[in-house]
Amino acid sequence: MTNINLATDVVIISGATASGKSSFAISLAKKVKKAVIINADSAQVYTNAPILANIPTEAERQGVSHKLFALQPITEYFSVMMWLQLVKQEISQAQAKGMLPIVVGGSAMYLLSLLEGISPIPSNILYRTKAENLYEKKRSSRVCQPC
């Protein structure tokens, strides 16, 4: 294995759905011994969908630290900007502990935001509220209409 600097290096594993990213990351983490796996999959941040999101099982995670998996209910708002703030913290904490951060997932927007940055567009509550109200109005009108 190539020399790895645990203070500065980050491994990123990306690929298509069901391509073996998680199992490869786990085997790499076990080989390195001082590593932490950090989620970069937009579906795996949610708690209510472990099968749908294919979150590694407890048995698969055994002996390897996993971060940013199953963070919050699928009904709660979560954005790439929120993930970016969290992943940067996790990477810094891992490096401070002398651990190799292994960022793994298939969400290109998450990975690109980590590698290239993202514009910090402020949330506009007025537009968000209007959009949510319009969605609720349209949704309820479709649900209530007879077939």
Regions from the PLM with identified roles:
Residues 1-147:
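Phosphate/pyrophosphate-binding catalytic cores of soluble transferases and nucleic-acid-acting enzymes
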